Each structure stands twice: as structure tokens, then as C-alpha cells.
Design a protein with these regions (language model features):
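A cytosolic small-molecule/anion-sensing beta-strand core signal
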Residues: 21, 70, 146-147
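A charged helix-plus-loop insertion that forms the helical arch/lid used to bind
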Residues: 79-90
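A short acidic/small-residue loop/turn micro-motif
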Residues: 32-35, 89, 158-160, 166
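Glycine-rich phosphate-binding loop of actin/hexokinase-like ATP-binding domains
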Residues: 128-185
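ATP-binding/phosphotransfer module of carbohydrate and carboxylate kinases, centering on a glycine-rich
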Residues: 1-65, 75-78, 96, 100-106, ...
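Short hydrophobic alpha-helix segments
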Residues: 29-31, 85, 154
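Generic structural signal for well-ordered beta-strand positions
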Residues: 26, 82, 151-152
Length: 314
């Protein structure tokens, strides 16, 4: 069985795995993504350390390629991550130093684009030719397969759906520097700031829970706290606007939600989002990933396997 190493570089965690050509994860390792240092070289070094650990395992002897999925934007020509709002350094060099270190082909793909490949290979979208994958994590990202082909765009950044404009009322600023983007409202990083802006605008004076984290806000909604439920109505509208734009753009038969917010609170997200989409558009099937956060890893592996075999990576 052909084996590759897959890496998932996120804003919070750095994961790596040995993955077989049958989508089996043979070994897995994870560390926090480095945020301190003089340059992105500290992240490159952390990836190299994870790869070295996996290659030292008995299963690592047959590795033929390395696939890296990362939060974007990406510069695929140089093999860099560049100016990502969710990574601490403006440039992280990936393919050059890692390829030089191990003498293996290294491919780089956006983590959400990898996610849709992972879902289509081994998850909820297996066998589907028109799929959108949406990750609700530190940021919001997406990937789309249309008529069986992965959409990458000119620079591999097609599907940066977190930057869909969804609001002009609160005018919250996104990590990219512009205002009104979906990610500025509904990502795990930014939900607390949206709650604070909504609370002020709605003149909500008493809150019986700590609104400083999405976990606390969604947890209060699960216990039917009236303030949290009122906020879910507003958040559901924002999510519906983002997903409606995705449906119109890609015409998917299935949308797979992933990321911590979807995995832990997907029932709440869908409950407050779906009715607001259904007013305007036919609903595709919307479901939560069953791959326990490993869709980008599996997608990075699928991409690396195809590239190593001479394919386009899809």
C-alpha cells in the first residue's frame, strides 16, 4: 500500500499523519501551532519535526510524498503561506525547505480545499460530484468540487468564502482588514466580538453567562438561555447569508460542515440557519462531518497521492 504524510497547518493546531492509499490513518501526531518567534521558519521547523517523527515509525519507511494543507492565502508558485489572518507570521515557506530536507515531493493546498477532498474520499460526500465543504473554525473557509473537479482558481485560493460580505449594519472588521465579512461574525475567533456588538445594539443589559468564548455562548443556547437564543437568531441569519451565497455560486448536492463549532454545536448552527436559507433557495443536504476533524488531513493525503502519481492533485 502506498503511504504519504499529510500535514494540516491551522491557526490553532498543527497535525500530521501517516495515511495509506485506502484512506486509513496509520499514525497521527499534533502540537499547538507556533505563534512566537522571529519568522515563519519556526512553523516550518515544527512541520519538519512532525514529519521526522512519523518517518521514524515502521510504517514511515514506504512514504512516497508529503501533502500540506494550510490556512490561506497561499502562493502555490513559491510554495508559501502568505499573509494568513489566522497564522502569526506573514510568510511561511513550505514546499522548498520541506522538500529539500526529505527529498520527497511536497504539495501545498488550502486546508478547506483539502477538506472537501477528504470528505469526498472518505466522508459524508463520498461518491458525490457536487460538494461544498465549510469549516467553522478559527476562521471560516470553504472548498468546492463541481462536476467532479476541485475548484482551485488562479492561485489556489478559490473558495475563500469567509470573506463573503454578509453585513453592513455592525460593520465588524475581519482579520484581513476589511469589514462585513462572514468570518468577522461567525468564526470561533470572532463570535464573542459579534455578541458584544449585538448586545450593545440590542441594549441587552443583563447576561447570565460568560460571553467571552463561543463555547460559553453556544453552551448557554443549549440550556435555552433566552439571551443566547436571541443571539442565535441573529447569528443564524448571518450564517444563512453566507451559505446562501455558496449555494448560488456552486449549486451543490451536499454541504458538509466541519470545524469545532460544527462538530460540537452543529445541531444548533443548522437549526437557526436552515429555515433562513429555505425562504429564498432550494436547500441541498446540509450535514456535519463524521471525520472528527481529519478531513483536511485526508484531503492533503489524497492531493499528495494524486500529484505523486502525475495527476493534477484532484
Amino acid at each position: 500500500m502506498t503511504t504519504v504524510i499529510a500535514v494540516d497547518l491551522g491557526g490553532t493546531n498543527l497535525r500530521a499523519a501517516l495515511v495509506g492509499s485506502d484512506a486509513t490513518i496509520l499514525a497521527h501526531t499534533a502540537v499547538p501551532t507556533p505563534t512566537a518567534g522571529l519568522s515563519g521558519a519556526v512553523i516550518t521547523a515544527a512541520i519538519i519535526a512532525r514529519v521526522e517523527a512519523l518517518l521514524a515509525l515502521p510504517e514511515g519507511r514506504e512514504v512516497t510524498a508529503i501533502g500540506v494543507a494550510s490556512a490561506g492565502p497561499l502562493d502555490p508558485g513559491r510554495g508559501w503561506v502568505t499573509n494568513s489572518p489566522n497564522i502569526a507570521f506573514p510568510v511561511v515557506e513550505i514546499t522548498g525547505p520541506i522538500g529539500d530536507r526529505f527529498g520527497l515531493p511536497v504539495s501545498l493546498i488550502n486546508d478547506a480545499r483539502a477538506g472537501v477532498l477528504g470528505e469526498r474520499w472518505a466522508g459524508a460526500a463520498r461518491g458525490s460530484d457536487n460538494v461544498v465543504y465549510i469549516t467553522l473554525s478559527t476562521g471560516i473557509g470553504g472548498g468546492a468540487v463541481v462536476n467532479g473537479r476541485l475548484l482551485l482558481g488562479m492561485d489556489g485560493n478559490a473558495g475563500d468564502i469567509g470573506h463573503i460580505p454578509v453585513d453592513t449594519h455592525y460593520n465588524l472588521v475581519c482579520g484581513c482588514g476589511f469589514a462585513g465579512h462572514w468570518e468577522a461574525y461567525a468564526s470561533a475567533k470572532n463570535i464573542p466580538q459579534f455578541f458584544a456588538a449585538w448586545r450593545k445594539a440590542a441594549d441587552v443589559r443583563r447576561v447570565a453567562f460568560d460571553a467571552g468564548s463561543p463555547r460559553a455562548i453556544f453552551g448557554a443556547a443549549r440550556t435555552e438561555d433566552p439571551v443566547a437564543l436571541a443571539f442565535m437568531e441573529v447569528l443564524g441569519e448571518v450564517n444563512a447569508r453566507g451559505v446562501s451565497a455558496v449555494i448560488v455560486a456552486y449549486d451543490p448536492e451536499i454541504i458538509v460542515l466541519d470545524g469545532p463549532l460544527a462538530r460540537y454545536y452543529g445541531d444548533i448552527v443548522i437549526r437557526y440557519m436552515e429555515p433562513r436559507i429555505d425562504r429564498y433557495l432550494p436547500l441541498p443536504r446540509i450535514t456535519v462531518s463524521s471525520l472528527a476533524g481529519r478531513s483536511p488531513l485526508l484531503g492533503a493525503a489524497a492531493y499528495a497521492l494524486d500529484r505523486a502519481a502525475g495527476g493534477p492533485g484532484i
